Amino acid sequence: MSKKIVTFGEIMLRLTTPDNLRIQQSHDFLVNYGGSEANVAISIANFGGEVEYITRLPDNALGETCIAELRSHNIGTKHILFGGHRLGTYYMEKAAAMRNSNVIYDRENSSFSELKPGMINWREIFKDASIFHWSGIDAALTPGLAEVCKEAIDIAKEMGLTISYDINYRKNLWNYGKTAQEVLRPLMTSSDIMFGSEGEYALVTG
């Protein structure tokens, strides 16, 4: 069986204040592209693994830059979808002295968040893969994405893939009327490998 690993998630534009400044003090931002599942893909590629990243990007210069960034790390991008108009963005103040880090998300109505079941050809993607990796962030964003996660997990399980799951609980992302417990507990039962702290596990299992 192929050793290819498939990761699924949202790659985002990160705008970081320079020199430990607050957002209110900044006139410039440092630009990076990344995300939890993209970082997993980069780590796999850095260790010499074969990895394919699945996401949806806007068909513009920002989306093209994300593709270039992923390819620079030898990550497969041939199954990435294009559509929608927005790249998820977040603004970051790094921790400094007695101050905690601060993150402001702007990802509502992003290209990724508009994904629905049936839009991704999982059978084609999984036919030469052995592991599927997803995270709780994916299911936290919208009900449609929670259904996409279930769709991917069900097909991966049917096709004999090992399923890797990062709990990655983010309280502030669960805003569509369902709790993490309601959504994630059924999805977790099909996972073979799980990452997370004891606290995260307790939160999503009750």
Predicted regions and their residues:
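Glycine-rich phosphate/adenosyl-contacting loop at the front of the ribokinase-like
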Residues: 1-76
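General beta-strand structural signal in soluble alpha/beta enzymes
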Residues: 7-8, 79, 105, 164-165, ...
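Short secondary-structure boundary/capping elements
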Residues: 32-39, 117, 176-179
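Conserved N-terminal subdomain of the carbohydrate kinase-like
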Residues: 50-136
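Glycine-rich beta-alpha junction loops
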Residues: 11, 84, 109, 169-171, ...
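Short, glycine/charged-enriched secondary-structure capping and boundary segments
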Residues: 20-23, 67-69, 119-120, 146-149, ...
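Conserved beta-alpha-beta core of the PfkB/ribokinase-like small-molecule kinase fold
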Residues: 131, 137-206
